[in-house]
């Protein structure tokens, strides 16, 4: 809707050619990776580039310089900045700049979604923390439901890789809510909603980060680590750890839900029958997640501010002799 261009940026990285439009309700819409600006905006950019003798510019404008209305031409979609292919980065930010607005739930676009999400993988992991340092191993990975009882450790957790789809677009969309059940009782529920950039910094605490690095898959896990920044959006029992104290067969249900309430369910049976890994960690020092950490010895210095870690970790330090022969 109506507003004014409040900022224009040009950079060889990031958004490249970017426009920021501030609206009467205080929100700011962002248009990144543009190919070009309208002639009036391009003229202003060129003047500032000559004035500063710099290609990169960041121009902040008052409300009376470039007022705009719906339908006005501001530029073309492009591939500028840190972009792998032509597209428009469109984003709306909250009035206080603390985070993005969910443009679908806020009604910026009309859409009809009756397509349920797609579960691509469900992983089961053993869990052991008797030493204060969590140890876990992958027990088994599934592509969907399984009726055969899976033998698990008496403590375990679950993670799921899922995406959402909508009719009329091949794009892969995010999941709005994840929930894990044991015998019908909720063990973990995470509902995204609106979030802040501060919360976004701890996104890796929600997922199996090691698996994302290894394969690129993003699996949201039931395990709630102590440094998780999304705890206000999470309801869990026993920090998302499933606990079995008998030899019976138990039911595990995984539910993912999109913004329109469409759900996909995967069901599993589990039975206690394997031991979690014993404490075989070999480490020199333990790094607490809740405190700053500093360590130094000849040739090595480690310094971590408080809350650098999502959970306490171990560290083993070794040195490599670099005085050997080198060849050109």
Model-derived features: positions:
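Active-site loop architecture of trypsin-fold serine endopeptidases
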Residues: 18, 77-88
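Short, charged beta-turn/beta-strand-edge "cap" motif at the junction between a beta-strand
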Residues: 10-13, 74, 78-82
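Proteolytic processing hotspots in large secreted/extracellular or virion-associated proteins
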Residues: 277-280, 316-328
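Predominantly extracellular/luminal regions of secreted and cell-surface proteins
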Residues: 291-315
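Long, low-complexity serine/threonine/glycine- and acidic-rich segments characteristic of extracellular
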Residues: 39, 69, 112, 125-274
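Proline-centered linker/hinge motifs at extracellular inter-domain junctions
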Residues: 100, 114-121, 293
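Zn2+-dependent peptidoglycan hydrolase active-site motif and core
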Residues: 2-61
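A structural signal for short beta-strand/turn segments enriched in small hydrophobics and glycine
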Residues: 3-5, 65-77
